[in-house]
């Protein structure tokens, strides 16, 4: 398990493609993070579910990314799921950190690595994030990287056996590129 970072110290994060040989490490990290994830996300917690997740990544309708620290340890996951092509070119953004990596800016770094890929390599036009209204940290995260609140979808996602309301946050490729351009000029 990682050593908590303090203040401005943030462990550098990089993206890594999930692979079959990661199953044991993922299942251990998920088990250690149950309390952290309870009621918010449902990551794969069995070998069968992990295999299914990998298969989805391979079918083109889903992009999965591991966030790994400088020691190669799993810090979190960023998924682009339910990819719709044609006139939409959109996907849903999902993410979570593992226990020991929360509140360190890890996910902010991770999303700043994934979004250029989403709007470049994956040729997406729009990303949407569904966030439970009480998840203040997640709301701040997406707002700080340029997502805009579009409304609330009532009882829209079933997590932990319960239907839960979710705020709908979104960003388009143009909005992302505009923010990136302004950051470079600053």
Protein language model regions, located:
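Conserved GNAT-fold acetyl-CoA-binding loop/helix
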Residues: 35-53
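Juxtamembrane/interface motifs at transmembrane-helix termini
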Residues: 44-48, 58, 96-97
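A short helix-loop-beta-strand connector motif used in the catalytic cores of GNAT acetyltransferases and
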Residues: 55-66
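Acyl-donor (CoA/ACP) binding surface of acyl/acetyltransferases
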Residues: 1-34, 68-186
């Amino acid at each position: 398990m990682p050593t908590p970072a303090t203040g401005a110290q943030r462990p550098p994060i990089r993206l890594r493609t999930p692979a079959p040989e990661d199953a044991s490490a993922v299942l251990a990290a998920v088990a250690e993070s149950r309390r952290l994830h309870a009621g918010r996300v449902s990551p794969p917690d069995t070998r069968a579910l992990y295999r299914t997740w990998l298969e989805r990544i391979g079918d083109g309708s889903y992009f999965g990314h591991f966030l790994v620290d400088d020691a190669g340890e799993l810090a979190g996951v960023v998924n682009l799921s339910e990819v719709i092509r044609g006139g939409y070119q959109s996907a849903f953004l999902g993410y979570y950190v593992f226990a020991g990596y929360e509140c360190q800016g890890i996910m902010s770094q991770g999303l700043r690595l994934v979004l250029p890929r989403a709007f470049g390599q994956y040729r997406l036009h729009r990303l949407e994030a569904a966030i439970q209204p009480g998840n203040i940290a997640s709301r701040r995260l997406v707002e700080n990287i340029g997502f805009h609140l579009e409304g609330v979808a009532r009882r829209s996602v079933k997590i932990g056996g319960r239907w839960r309301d979710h705020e709908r946050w979104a960003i388009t490729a143009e909005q992302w590129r505009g923010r990136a351009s302004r950051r470079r000029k600053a």
